[in-house]
Regions:
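Residue-level signal for inorganic ion chemistry
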Residues: 28, 81, 118, 178, ...
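Phosphate/ribose-recognition catalytic cores of enzymes acting on nucleotide-derived substrates
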Residues: 195-307
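Glycine-rich, Lys/Arg-enriched anion-binding loops that position phosphate/diphosphate groups
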Residues: 141-242
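Short acidic-hydrophobic, aromatic-tinged amphipathic segments that line or gate anion-handling sites
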Residues: 2-9, 90
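A short acidic, often aromatic-flanked loop/helix-cap motif at beta-alpha or helix-coil junctions
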Residues: 9-12, 96-99, 155-159
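N-terminal catalytic cores of NTP/NDP-binding nucleotidyl/phosphoryl-transfer enzymes
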Residues: 10-73
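N-terminal Rossmann-like or analogous alpha/beta NTP/dinucleotide-binding catalytic cores
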Residues: 60-144
Length: 307
């Protein structure tokens, strides 16, 4: 997959293509529908599949105090798009240059790509202050001679799938429901840091990921059944998100994961924690023995949820 990181580089990709356009800030099922539609069209036209998106959330520039937590990292996005068979990813920073483009100027820049068709979602906007809509885009398609495919929004039950809805589910601990909208389990990746090793003393050693500086959506505090990816291999496990109320000495929330049937040193290594189901909320226990008993029950509950 070729990756283009600025508008000035667009001309470097000269092959005929079909372009999926969108912010794609979560790569949820609605986004995937747009991309899969573009993929089918590209195959039909014997063209390359291009995805045009932004490497940062537009709010970082236009509403810096209201940037929503990320549902996916840049590396995860690139990996998923490569798995989908994308030929070229246009992943440019949303900055003042982009924010100031009028809808027509945006399309003129996009014409550096040799596209025959654009595919967007029904709520797609573009250009300065989102002045461009699917209706102005349809008029431009007619005038400029390209095909436009507008995909209807995708729903899960009675709810339209959106990144906002998914963030709300994650914040409420409803990770199974979030997974239904994402089309995959929500995950957090990070580098394993040293902790206080209380888990090891309790018989449940944990791999700890600090969440303080990670601008990602963090599930509601509690215990979760998880799958953990270590060196490309998947393990079952249980994770706790929170402040360790029994000990009361944690100032920032932590993600602590006990990986079942795993031995080895993980300090300094990357791992990915995929949230499958919330088991319970955070509890302050009267003592260590009560905590141990609960951890044993938690492990049983997690193993059951992961079957």
């Amino acid at each position: 997959m070729e990756i283009i990181t600025s508008l000035e580089q667009l001309h470097k990709f000269s092959a005929p293509c079909v372009v999926a356009l969108g912010t794609f800030d979560g790569l949820h099922r609605g986004h995937l529908d747009v991309i899969e539609t573009a993929k089918a069209k590209a195959h039909e036209c014997n063209s390359q599949l291009a995805v045009f998106t932004f490497s940062n959330h537009p709010f970082e520039w236009i509403r810096p105090g209201m940037v929503p937590p990320a549902l996916i990292t840049g590396a995860q996005k690139q990996e998923l798009l490569q798995q989908l068979g994308v030929d070229v990813l246009v992943d440019i920073p949303f900055n003042q240059q982009v924010a100031d483009l009028s809808p027509q100027e945006f399309l003129q820049r996009l014409q550096q790509l040799d596209y025959s068709c654009l595919v967007v979602g029904a709520n797609f906007t573009y250009g300065c202050r989102g002045q461009g809509t699917v209706y102005t885009l349809a008029a431009s398609a007619k005038a400029m001679g390209f095909e436009l495919i507008v995909r209807e929004l995708v729903s899960e039950g009675a709810t339209v799938i959106s990144s906002t809805a998914i963030r709300q589910l994650i914040a409420a601990g409803e990770v199974a429901e979030a997974a239904a909208m994402l089309g995959r389990s929500y995950s957090i990746s990070g580098t394993v840091a040293h902790g206080n090793e209380r888990g090891r003393l309790l018989g449940y050693p944990t791999a700890n990921i600090e969440l303080e500086d990670a601008h990602v959506a963090v599930p509601l505090g509690g215990v979760y059944a998880v799958r953990v990816i270590v060196n490309g291999k998947s393990y079952h496990g249980m994770a706790n998100i929170g402040y360790n109320p029994t000990f009361g000495d944690v100032a920032q929330p932590r993600l602590e994961t006990n990986i079942f049937d795993f031995t080895g040193d993980l300090y300094g290594k990357q791992l990915t924690v995929q949230f499958v189901q919330r088991i319970r909320g955070e509890v302050k226990f009267a003592g260590i023995e009560q905590l141990k008993q609960q951890l044993a029950q938690d492990k049983n509950d997690c193993e059951e949820a992961l079957r």
